[in-house]
């Protein structure tokens, strides 16, 4: 069963129109492409159209329980008709009394309305506790009191007609259709046939049909006998009461054939008994159906994740279960306000949540941006079928191909295996045999590997384990610090005192100064020595020249 829609904030139709107008201005939506995501363990299982609805339309069905037989055949069927009439009265009188008590629980005195219907409901509930849904249903029953009174004004004419479907409009505030499933049977079997039937055969046919209809009535009104405010009549129950004539009312209320099957599956079409008259055997039911607004270009895409293989173990992708897409905008869709059918999603309100850039990039086809959570559970789904093919994690389960026989192996580093009829016609997984008919074309990406950086911890147990590892690392670090402190304690504190350090620094500076002065002095002496050598060399050369000049003379 799908989740029940929220009825706390009904959506006005003006809001529906505005939402539809805004969304219709956006460019057409493109579905999320599941081909690059399949090999990463993210499977697009399908799309559904998104609709917004409010339960605002009502109409009435007047079920004619007692058929009118042709005058010449009344005597033949008198015995089964009398028995049927007595059984009907016994079966439905508690229902009629309950309806009457609730409708009469609101009286007008002195111009003020005295609301006493809650006490009436509690009196009709076996447990003595009235829920909010029961109070709401009783309030709707009280509001339909005037319409029920108008129908009773016309009960004689409705009971006298031989038509199986008759539209009643005289003095009624809403559309009402009188239908008679048994009258339809009488018309088909007796009024439109030229064959003369014997009296005994007429009695037998009428008796059998009346008994079958009584069985249907008992099935429909079993939970309703005590209090009509407890349970609504489903669309299936309404069809049992009215037969195929139910379509006439729905068509009159504007339900098209293209929406009918989807609305029937949604359970949004319901009915509440509003009157029962034992004199004419008329049963009035108020039918409520939604007013639906289609949101153009808006669809809901359903995603499922598969446990994939990584170097850090098995993991599943962190993506929303349902996303909605309008144009290039992708957001997570909250379906708690919606009712699901096979093809449609009916919501009382549209609630979406923005996604992180990483998830958006992942769903757009960039599988390297996908994040995964470790899933070590043995019951984690290791395979999934899609369009006649299988996506399986052949490291978690044995992928045995029956035809042709063999074991399908998954290469190291591959997240999952894509198996179609090209690689295996008949596949056996955990004792389940599947005949494959689909095929993964070349557009499907394969051999995708999940990096270590893409696997994160999200589960409570895994987080506890990681916290334990962190605590162990911290303990090891503290032990190392204690060892270093013990080694520092062995060092001579006097040598590392502040005054000693200052002395060392001053002596070092003095040594550097003396060293620099010595270097400068040495350079000066070397320079002076070289100058003296040059002077002596010059004097020697002059003396030698003078001696040569004296010798020549």
UniProtKB/Swiss-Prot annotation:
Transmembrane segments: 501-521
Coiled coil: 142-170, 466-491
Lipid modification (S-palmitoyl cysteine), residues: 523
InterPro entries: Fusion_F0_Paramyxovir
Modification comment: The inactive precursor F0 is glycosylated and proteolytically cleaved into F1 and F2 to be functionally active. The cleavage is mediated by cellular proteases during the transport and maturation of the polypeptide.
GO BP of this protein: fusion of virus membrane with host plasma membrane; symbiont entry into host cell
Disulfide bond sites: 76-199, 338-347, 362-370, 394-399, 401-424
Region (Fusion peptide) residue spans: 117-141
Keywords on record: Cleavage on pair of basic residues, Coiled coil, Disulfide bond, Fusion of virus membrane with host cell membrane, Fusion of virus membrane with host membrane, Glycoprotein, Host cell membrane, Host membrane, Lipoprotein, Membrane, Palmitate, Signal, Transmembrane, Transmembrane helix, Viral envelope protein, Viral penetration into host cytoplasm, Virion, Virus entry into host cell
Localisation per UniProt entry: Virion membrane; Host cell membrane
Site feature: Cleavage: 116-117
GO CC list: host cell plasma membrane; membrane; viral envelope; virion membrane
Membrane topology: Single-pass type I membrane protein; Single-pass membrane protein
Topology Cytoplasmic: residue spans: 522-553
UniProt-annotated glycosylation sites, renumbered to this chain: 85, 191, 366, 447, 471
Location (main, coarse): virion
Membrane topology (Extracellular): 32-500
Signal peptide: 1-31
Similarity comment: Belongs to the paramyxoviruses fusion glycoprotein family.
Role of this protein: Class I viral fusion protein. Under the current model, the protein has at least 3 conformational states: pre-fusion native state, pre-hairpin intermediate state, and post-fusion hairpin state. During viral and plasma cell membrane fusion, the heptad repeat (HR) regions assume a trimer-of-hairpins structure, positioning the fusion peptide in close proximity to the C-terminal region of the ectodomain. The formation of this structure appears to drive apposition and subsequent fusion of viral and plasma cell membranes.
Quaternary data: Homotrimer of disulfide-linked F1-F2.
Name the record gives this protein: Fusion glycoprotein F0
């Amino acid at each position: 069963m799908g989740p029940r829609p929220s009825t706390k904030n009904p959506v006005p139709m003006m809001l529906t129109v505005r939402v539809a107008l805004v969304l219709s201005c956006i460019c057409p939506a493109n579905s999320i492409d599941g081909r690059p995501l399949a090999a990463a363990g993210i499977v697009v299982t399908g799309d559904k159209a998104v609709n917004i609805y409010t339960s605002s339309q009502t109409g009435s069905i007047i079920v004619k329980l007692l058929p009118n037989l042709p005058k010449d055949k009344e005597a033949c069927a008198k015995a089964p008709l009398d028995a049927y009439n007595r059984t009907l009265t016994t079966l439905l009188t508690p229902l009629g009394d309950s309806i009457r008590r609730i409708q009469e629980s609101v009286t007008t005195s002195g111009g003020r309305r005295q609301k006493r219907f809650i006490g009436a409901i509690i009196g009709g509930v076996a447990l003595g506790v009235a829920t909010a849904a029961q109070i709401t249903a009783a309030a709707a029953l009280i509001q339909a009191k005037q319409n029920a009174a108008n129908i009773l004004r016309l009960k004689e004419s409705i009971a006298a007609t031989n038509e199986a479907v008759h539209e009643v409009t005289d003095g009624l505030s809403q559309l009402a259709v009188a239908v008679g499933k048994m009258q339809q049977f009488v018309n088909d079997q007796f009024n439109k046939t030229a064959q003369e039937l014997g009296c005994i055969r007429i009695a037998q046919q009428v008796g059998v049909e009346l008994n079958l209809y009584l069985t249907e009535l008992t099935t429909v009104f079993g939970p309703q006998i005590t209090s009509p405010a407890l349970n609504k009549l489903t669309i299936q129950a309404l069809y049992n009461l009215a037969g195929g004539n139910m379509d006439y009312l729905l068509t009159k209320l504007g339900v098209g054939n293209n929406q009918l099957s989807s609305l029937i599956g949604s359970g949004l079409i319901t009915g509440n008994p509003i009157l029962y008259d034992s004199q004419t055997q008329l049963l009035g039911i108020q039918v409520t159906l939604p007013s639906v607004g289609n949101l153009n270009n808006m669809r809901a895409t359903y995603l499922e994740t598969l446990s994939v293989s990584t170097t850090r173990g098995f993991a599943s992708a962190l993506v929303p279960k349902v996303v909605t897409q309008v144009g290039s905008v992708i957001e997570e869709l909250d379906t708690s306000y919606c009712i699901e059918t096979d093809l449609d999603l009916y919501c009382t309100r549209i609630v979406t949540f923005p996604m992180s850039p990483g998830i958006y990039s992942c769903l757009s086809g960039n599988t390297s941006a996908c994040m995964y959570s470790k899933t070590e559970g043995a019951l984690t789904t290791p395979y999934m079928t899609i369009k006649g093919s299988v996506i399986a994690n052949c490291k978690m389960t044995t992928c045995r191909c029956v035809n042709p026989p063999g074991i399908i192996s998954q290469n190291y580093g591959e997240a999952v295996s894509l198996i179609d009829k090209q690689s295996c016609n008949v596949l056996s997984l955990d004792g389940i045999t599947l005949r494959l008919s689909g095929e993964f074309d070349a557009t499907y990406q394969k051999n995708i590997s999940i990096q270590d950086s893409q696997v994160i911890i999200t589960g409570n147990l895994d987080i506890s384990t990681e916290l334990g590892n962190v605590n162990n690392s911290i303990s090891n670090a503290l032990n190392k610090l204690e060892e270093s402190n013990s080694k520092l304690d062995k060092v001579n504190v006097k040598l590392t005192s502040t005054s000693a350090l200052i002395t060392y620094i001053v002596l070092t500076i003095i040594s550097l100064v003396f060293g620099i002065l010595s270097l400068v002095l040495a350079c000066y002496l070397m320079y002076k020595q070289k100058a003296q050598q040059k002077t002596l060399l010059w004097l020697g050369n002059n003396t030698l020249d003078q001696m040569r000049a004296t010798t020549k003379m």
